[in-house]
């Protein structure tokens, strides 16, 4: 589309080489488990369960907010991938066939864990909020690292996914506070 043939940057290729250098079976197995745990199907299933829980608890505002933001996230990811049409690294440890920029795993998992953190901690103490947000950040970073380690993405794909997630979250919280 507009940004077709968006080539990897020097930092992308050097990071890719570094991931080859640290490759080992245990880290590969762990990374594949994380990849499957935070793929589209897994996040959709978990999101439906969480939305059903909110519905069951008569928290329809949370249900609608959470479900709609996950749908918006999916749409943003699809739009950006089609806009940039960036090819993934050739030496993948886990084959992916669609475009790579931004990382859908990094974007969706970051929105997912931080939305849950936001909804869970709204009525909690500052200490609890800090712990929950730190945990969400660690999960997001692990997902991002595994995408780079598996060479399913360039470093900048993952960083762009984090930026997209941050923008989605800021927009989501802005809208949620007004309604």
Predicted regions and their residues:
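Short helix-capping/hinge motifs at transmembrane helix termini and TM-loop junctions
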Residues: 3-5, 57-58, 84-85, 150-151, ...
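Membrane-interface loops
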Residues: 10, 46-47, 56-126
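Alpha-helical transmembrane segments of multi-pass membrane proteins, especially transporters
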Residues: 17, 65-70, 158-162
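Membrane-interface helix-boundary signature
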Residues: 28-31, 63, 126-133
């Amino acid at each position: 589309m507009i940004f077709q043939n968006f080539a990897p940057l020097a930092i992308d290729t050097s990071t890719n080489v570094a991931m080859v250098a640290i490759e080992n079976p245990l880290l590969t197995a762990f990374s594949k488990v994380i990849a499957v745990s935070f793929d589209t199907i897994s996040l959709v299933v978990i999101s439906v369960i969480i939305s059903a829980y909110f519905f069951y608890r008569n928290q329809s505002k949370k249900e609608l907010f959470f479900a709609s933001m996950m749908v918006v996230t999916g749409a943003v990811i699809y739009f950006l991938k089609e806009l940039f049409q960036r090819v993934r690294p050739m030496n993948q440890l886990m084959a992916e066939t669609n475009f790579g920029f931004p990382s859908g795993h990094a974007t969706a998992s970051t929105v997912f864990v931080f939305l849950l953190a936001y909804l869970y901690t709204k009525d909690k103490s500052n200490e609890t909020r800090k712990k929950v947000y730190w945990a969400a950040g660690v999960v997001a970073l692990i997902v991002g690292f595994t995408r780079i380690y598996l060479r399913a993405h360039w470093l900048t794909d993952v960083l762009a996914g984090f930026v997209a997630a941050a923008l989605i979250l800021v927009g989501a919280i802005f809208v949620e506070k007004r309604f």
